[in-house]
């Protein structure tokens, strides 16, 4: 049983049915904010060119934004999601996702996420 908020969120993440989350970890949570890392590899996460498939960054962004929303005590479903790919990423890269809740309304929420590579370079921007 979790004894900290961070442990609790990682226990919830482990119950996620998407297989890629096995390589992810929630590294920080506070009200309206969450951070995650994802260890990628070149066999499960890449397209035929060896670049990360687009679904990886947007999936990480969706997960970290949902976690940020959940820190405010709300269970959410994504109703709109967009992302901008800023830089190509090769398999084997550790990605870091940082999300913040921008709008905490009665019936909707809006969050933003930034995904960084190991060098701290921005590789993806998302809003949902």
Located regions from the model:
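Terminal targeting signals and extreme-terminal segments of soluble enzymes
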Residues: 1-128
